[in-house]
């Protein structure tokens, strides 16, 4: 399986311009042809925040043909239910129905208003026509942990029992489960955002930008690890 990062940022106007296939649909068809020649399954998994099942709808039916896509809404609902955090994009998931809805229909925002984005977001998923295995569910990822100010895993905020309950919910769901590295044994080490830019100005800009970003959420500059510092990398390996 090959994961395609942030496919919502791929700009391809081919379908609108001349009726051709979108790049992702082309990749899907090429991968299917290769899988047939090799006589083994090959999968493309998309990271997309569009909340649109067109991503995993077959190309023949007008979709993009991905084997599966990440389901961030499931993560968000689980995270809020377990930790009680409701800042930033977690705000809408404080809704008591969020967990039930995401565990049955993958997307919480399926045409509803997203306060974080300031607009209506997503489209409904019909479980009768879109299989649950098309959605990848998880309690932690490199993004959701690494993009926290100190890279703390969810286990730093909840009890082992709560973490086990959260794991049970996504492992036993209708979705394809994904276990984050170290989660299987309850690793307590952080996964901090680290970089190795050789350009001093670029490195400084990243470090300062990260501190400024988290300052808006109440973190002081001294609390946010410097991405360019080797100790930040060492703390995560």
For the regions a protein language model found, what residue spans apply to each?
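Active-site groove signature of glycoside hydrolases
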Residues: 1-14
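Alpha-helix N-cap/helix-initiation motif
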Residues: 8, 16, 156-159
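Glycan-recognition and catalytic cores of secretory/periplasmic carbohydrate-active enzymes
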Residues: 14-21
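Conserved alpha/beta catalytic core and glycan-binding cleft of carbohydrate-active enzymes
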Residues: 24-226
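Short, intrinsically disordered, charge-balanced linker/junction segments flanking boundaries
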Residues: 222-237
């Amino acid at each position: 399986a090959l994961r395609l990062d942030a496919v919502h940022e791929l700009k391809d106007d081919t379908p609108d311009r001349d009726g051709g296939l979108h790049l992702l649909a082309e990749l899907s068809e090429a991968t299917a042809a290769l899988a047939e020649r090799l006589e083994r399954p090959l999968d493309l998994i998309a990271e997309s925040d569009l909340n649109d099942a067109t991503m995993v709808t077959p190309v023949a039916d007008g979709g993009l043909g991905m084997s599966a896509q990440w389901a961030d809404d499931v993560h968000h609902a689980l995270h809020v239910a377990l930790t009680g955090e409701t800042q930033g994009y977690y705000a809408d998931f404080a809704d008591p129905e969020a967990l039930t809805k995401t565990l049955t229909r993958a997307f919480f925002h399926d045409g509803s208003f997203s306060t974080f984005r300031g607009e209506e977001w997503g489209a409904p998923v019909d479980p009768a026509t879109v299989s649950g295995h098309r959605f990848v569910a998880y309690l932690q990822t490199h993004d959701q942990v690494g993009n926290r100010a100190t890279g703390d895993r969810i286990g730093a905020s909840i009890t082992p029992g709560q973490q086990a309950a959260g794991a049970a919910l996504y492992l036993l769901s209708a979705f394809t489960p994904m276990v984050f590295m170290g989660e299987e044994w309850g690793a307590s080490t952080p996964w901090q955002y680290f970089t190795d830019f050789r350009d001093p100005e670029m490195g400084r800009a990243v470090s300062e930008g990260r501190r400024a970003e988290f300052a808006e959420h109440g973190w002081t500059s001294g609390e946010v690890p410097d991405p360019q510092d080797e100790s930040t990398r060492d703390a995560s390996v």
